[in-house]
C-alpha cells in the first residue's frame, strides 16, 4: 500500500506539473495511470512480496554488489547540478570551444590561419562594471538616516510598517491600496525586515537590473555580441540620464525593468513565425519554442505590473490585442487574456481609480511632490522633460546625439534602403517600422503635453506621467537600431554567397560602414551616461537625512496619544505645509490625500498653516490645534517677526532646534482621542479609559474604524463634528483604534498574479 501511495502521489505531482505546462492530454494520461496503479495495488502488493521472497533466497554479498551498480541519490543530484552548470556555462560562453575553423580551412594551403574568437564575454563585463559603478555612485547613501528624494518618501519602520502600507485600508477612501506597494512589502522580507536596506540596495542595482532586462530583449533580436550589450547598457542608463534614479522615482526605475519584457512578449505574439537570432548565433542551448498562450500570459503579467504604477499604460495591451485580432481574428482567447489579465490583478484598486480618475494619468506617488519643474520643446529630444535630478545638458546631448545618429541610420536602413532584408524584426516590409516611428512621435507628443498640463489628484494639481513616455520613446529608437543591425547582419550573410567579382552597391557600402561604426557610436552614449552616473547620477535631490522632527516630538507621536504635527515651511515667499504623524509620510503617502481624506480636517489644517506662515495667528491657536489632535507646531524659514507673532499665542511652549527652525509644543496634552462624560467637556485620552461616556477619534469619517477599549469593541454614536464617536458603556482599559486589514485585496492580487505567472510559464512538449 505504501508503494502504491507513493506512485499515486508521484503521478498527481506530474499531473500538476503538466497542467501548469499547458499539456492537458499528457496530464490526463498521468492522472489515469496513477488511478490505475492505485486500483491495482493488490497486484503491486503481490509483486512486492515476490520480490522480497526472491531477495531472501539470494546471497547477501550478491545483493550488495548489485546495489553498488545502481546510482545513489547523491550521484543523481550531482548529475543534475553538473548538467545545469554545463548549460549555464554554454550560455555564458557560447564560443568557448569554438574557433571558427572549418574542414576547408584545415585542408587548404592556409590552414595555419585560424579565426579565433575571444572568450571575454561582453555581458560579464557589463555586469561587473555596472556593479562597481553603482557601488561608487551611491557613496552618498552610505550612513545613518533615511534616503529621501523628490518622489521617494521615507521608508517605514520595520517589516510590519511595510506590510501596513500595502494592506491597511485608508480612511475615507474606497478600494484597495496601489498594488505596487506589495513589491517593497515582499522585498522587505528579503532584507530581514529592514525596508531602508532594501531602498539602498535597489538604488545600487536598479540600473543593472534594467540593463539585464533589456539584454534579454536585444539578444532575442540581434543575438549575442558587443552591440547587444551596448544597447542594453544604454537602456540601463536611461533612468540615470533622465533623473529617475536621483528623484527616487518608483515609476521610472520599475518601468525600466518592466517595459523590455512587455516588448519581448509583444514581439513573440506579433511575429510567431520568426526564428530566434540567438539560435542562429549558436547560443540556443536548451531553448524551446514559446507558445502563443505563454507569450500572451507573459505580456498580461508584465502589463499588470506596469499599470499598477501608471494605469494609462493599459492602452498598450489593448493596442496589442487589437493588432492580434486584426491579423488573427480567431485568436480571441489571446486578445482577451492580454486585455483582461492586467485588470484582474489591479481589480481591488479600481474603485479608488474610479473615484479619483486623475490618478489614471499619473505615475506612482503623484501628490508627494506636485510642484516639480518641467520643460518642453527641444529639451524633450535629449530627455530633459523633468528638471530635478536630470543630467546636465552637456551629458544629455553627448549621450543622446549618438543615439539619434544611429536611429536615423536605422530609419534609412529599414525604410528607405531598397536592399534591406525584409525578414527582420519587423516581419513585414516596412509597415511595422513605420508603426514604430508613429509610436515614437506619439510618445514625444504625450511627453510634451504632460510637461505643460496639470491634472487634479485629491485636490492637488500635478503633472501627468512623463517618464513612461520618455522611456517608451527611447526604447522605440533602440529597437529600430536593433532591427537595422539585424537586417544588416542578414544582408551580410547573404553577401557571402555573391560572386567575388561582383561590386557592392552604394547601399551595401553604407550598410557596411554603419554596421561597422554602430558599436563605437553607442559606446559614446554609454560612456557619457556612465560618467554622469559615477559623478552625480545618484545625488541631486537624493540624500540621506535624519529625522526633521526632534526626538521628543516623534516620541509623543508614537505614544498612546498618537498626536499629529503641523509642519510649515516658508521658502521664497511661498508656504508649504503638511500634517504628519508616526506613520506619515512614508511609502504610499503620495497615493492618498496629502493632509486628510476628510475635507474638514484638511481645510482647517490649511487655514492654520497659512495663518502660521504669515504670522496672523488667532488668539485661540492652541485650542484649534488641539481640536485636530495636533501636539506640536513646526515652522522653518519664517522671519523673526512671524516667529514672534506665533510665539505670542497662548498655550504654546517654544523650543528652537536650529537657527531656521522653531518647534512649539501645544499645552494640555492634546490627543487624537477625546472622552466626553455626562455634564463635562471633552478631555484628551492619554491611554486608558476609566469612566463611561463617549469617545471621539479625530480621524476621517469611515464606518470601517475598529475602536476598542480593553479589547471590547465599541458601538458607534452620533457625531456632528470632526471625527467618529463611540459609546464606551461598561468597557474599561486601553483605547485602541485602527482601520481593517484588506486581506481580500492582497489575496485577489496575489492569486491573479499567480494565475498569470502559470499561464506565462514554459509549455511542456505535446504528444
What is each of the regions a protein language model found here?
Residues 110, 165, 338-424, 547:
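Periplasmic/ER-lumenal interhelical loops and adjacent helix-loop junctions
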Residues 135-210:
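Membrane-interface coil-to-helix junctions
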Residues 670-767:
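Active-site-proximal, structured, solvent-exposed surfaces of multi-pass membrane proteins
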Residues 207-220, 224-327, 334-350, 525, ...:
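Membrane-embedded helix bundles of polyisoprenyl
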Residues 488-532:
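Signature aromatic-anchored transmembrane alpha helix within multi-pass, membrane-resident enzymes
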Residues 1-39:
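Active-site-adjacent helix/loop segment of glycosyltransferases
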Residues 557-628, 713:
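Extracytoplasmic/lumenal acceptor-recognition loop(s) of multi-pass membrane glycoenzymes
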Residues 101-139, 758-767:
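Start-transfer (signal-anchor) and selected internal transmembrane alpha helices
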Amino acid at each position: 500500500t505504501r508503494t502504491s501511495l507513493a506512485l499515486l502521489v508521484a503521478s498527481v505531482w506530474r499531473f500538476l506539473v503538466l497542467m501548469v505546462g499547458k499539456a492537458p492530454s499528457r496530464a490526463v494520461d498521468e492522472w489515469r495511470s496513477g488511478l490505475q496503479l492505485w486500483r491495482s495495488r493488490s497486484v503491486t502488493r503481490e509483486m512486492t512480496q515476490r520480490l522480497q521472497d526472491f531477495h531472501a533466497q539470494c546471497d547477501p554479498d550478491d545483493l550488495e554488489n548489485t546495489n553498488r551498480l545502481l546510482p545513489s541519490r547523491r550521484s543523481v543530484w550531482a548529475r543534475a547540478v553538473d548538467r545545469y552548470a554545463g548549460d549555464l556555462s554554454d550560455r555564458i560562453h557560447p564560443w568557448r570551444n569554438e574557433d571558427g575553423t572549418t574542414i576547408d580551412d584545415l585542408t587548404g594551403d592556409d590552414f595555419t590561419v585560424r579565426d579565433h574568437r575571444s572568450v571575454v564575454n561582453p555581458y560579464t563585463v557589463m555586469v561587473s562594471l555596472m556593479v562597481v559603478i553603482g557601488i561608487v555612485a551611491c557613496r552618498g547613501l552610505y550612513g545613518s538616516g533615511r534616503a529621501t528624494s523628490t518622489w521617494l518618501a521615507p521608508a517605514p519602520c520595520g517589516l510590519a510598517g511595510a506590510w501596513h502600507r500595502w494592506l491597511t485600508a485608508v480612511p475615507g477612501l474606497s478600494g484597495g491600496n496601489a498594488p505596487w506597494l506589495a513589491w517593497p512589502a515582499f522585498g522587505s522580507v528579503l532584507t530581514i525586515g529592514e525596508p531602508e536596506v532594501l531602498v539602498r540596495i535597489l538604488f545600487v542595482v536598479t540600473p543593472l537590473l534594467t540593463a539585464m532586462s533589456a539584454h534579454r530583449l536585444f539578444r532575442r533580436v540581434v543575438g549575442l555580441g558587443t552591440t547587444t550589450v551596448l544597447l542594453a547598457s544604454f537602456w540601463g542608463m536611461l533612468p540615470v540620464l533622465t533623473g529617475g534614479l536621483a528623484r527616487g522615482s518608483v515609476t521610472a526605475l520599475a518601468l525600466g525593468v518592466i517595459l523590455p519584457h512587455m516588448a519581448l512578449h509583444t514581439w513573440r505574439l506579433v511575429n510567431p513565425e520568426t526564428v530566434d537570432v540567438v539560435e542562429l548565433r549558436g547560443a540556443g542551448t536548451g531553448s524551446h519554442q514559446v507558445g502563443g498562450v505563454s507569450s500572451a500570459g507573459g505580456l498580461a503579467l508584465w502589463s499588470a505590473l506596469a499599470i499598477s504604477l501608471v494605469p494609462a499604460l493599459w492602452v498598450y495591451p489593448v493596442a496589442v490585442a487589437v493588432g492580434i485580432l486584426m491579423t488573427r481574428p480567431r485568436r480571441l482567447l489571446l486578445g482577451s487574456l492580454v486585455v483582461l489579465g492586467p485588470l484582474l490583478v489591479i481589480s481591488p484598486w479600481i474603485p479608488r481609480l474610479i473615484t479619483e480618475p486623475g490618478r489614471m494619468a499619473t505615475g506612482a506617488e503623484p501628490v508627494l511632490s506636485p510642484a516639480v519643474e518641467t520643460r518642453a520643446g527641444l529639451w524633450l529630444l535629449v530627455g530633459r522633460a523633468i528638471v530635478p535630478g536630470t543630467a546636465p545638458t552637456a551629458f544629455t546631448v553627448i549621450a543622446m546625439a549618438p543615439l539619434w545618429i544611429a536611429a536615423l541610420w536605422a530609419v534609412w536602413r529599414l525604410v528607405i534602403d531598397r536592399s534591406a532584408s525584409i525578414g527582420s524584426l519587423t516581419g513585414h516590409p516596412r509597415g511595422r517600422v513605420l508603426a514604430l516611428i508613429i509610436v515614437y512621435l506619439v510618445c514625444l507628443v504625450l511627453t510634451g503635453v504632460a510637461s505643460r498640463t496639470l491634472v487634479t489628484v485629491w485636490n492637488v494639481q500635478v503633472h501627468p506621467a512623463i517618464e513612461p513616455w520618455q522611456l517608451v520613446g527611447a526604447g522605440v529608437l533602440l529597437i529600430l537600431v536593433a532591427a537595422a543591425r539585424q537586417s544588416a547582419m542578414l544582408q551580410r550573410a547573404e553577401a557571402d554567397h555573391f560572386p567575388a567579382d561582383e561590386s557592392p552597391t552604394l547601399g551595401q557600402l553604407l550598410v557596411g560602414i554603419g554596421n561597422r561604426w554602430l558599436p563605437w557610436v553607442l559606446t559614446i552614449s554609454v560612456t557619457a551616461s556612465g560618467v554622469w552616473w559615477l559623478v552625480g547620477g545618484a545625488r541631486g535631490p537624493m540624500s540621506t537625512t535624519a529625522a526633521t522632527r526632534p526626538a521628543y516630538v516623534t516620541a509623543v507621536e508614537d505614544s498612546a496619544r498618537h498626536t499629529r504635527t503641523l509642519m510649515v515651511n516658508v521658502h521664497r515667499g511661498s508656504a508649504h505645509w503638511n500634517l504628519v504623524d508616526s506613520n506619515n509620510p512614508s511609502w504610499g503617502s503620495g497615493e492618498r490625500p496629502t493632509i486628510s481624506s476628510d475635507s474638514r480636517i484638511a481645510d482647517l489644517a490649511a487655514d492654520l498653516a497659512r495663518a502660521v506662515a504669515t504670522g496672523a495667528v488667532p488668539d485661540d491657536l492652541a485650542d484649534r490645534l488641539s481640536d485636530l489632535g495636533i501636539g506640536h507646531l513646526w515652522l522653518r524659514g519664517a522671519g523673526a517677526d512671524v516667529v514672534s507673532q506665533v510665539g505670542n499665542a497662548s498655550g504654546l511652549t517654544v523650543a528652537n532646534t536650529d537657527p531656521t527652525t522653531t518647534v512649539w509644543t501645544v499645552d494640555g496634552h492634546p490627543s487624537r482621542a477625546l472622552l466626553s462624560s455626562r455634564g463635562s467637556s471633552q478631555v484628551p485620552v492619554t491611554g486608558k479609559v476609566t469612566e463611561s461616556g463617549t469617545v471621539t477619534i479625530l480621524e476621517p469619517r469611515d464606518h470601517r474604524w475598529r475602536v476598542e477599549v480593553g479589547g471590547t469593541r465599541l458601538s458607534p454614536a452620533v457625531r456632528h463634528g470632526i471625527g467618529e464617536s463611540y459609546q464606551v458603556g461598561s468597557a474599561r482599559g486601553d483605547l485602541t483604534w485602527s482601520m481593517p486589514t484588506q486581506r481580500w485585496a492582497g489575496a485577489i492580487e496575489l492569486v491573479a498574479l499567480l494565475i498569470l505567472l502559470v499561464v506565462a510559464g514554459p509549455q511542456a512538449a505535446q504528444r
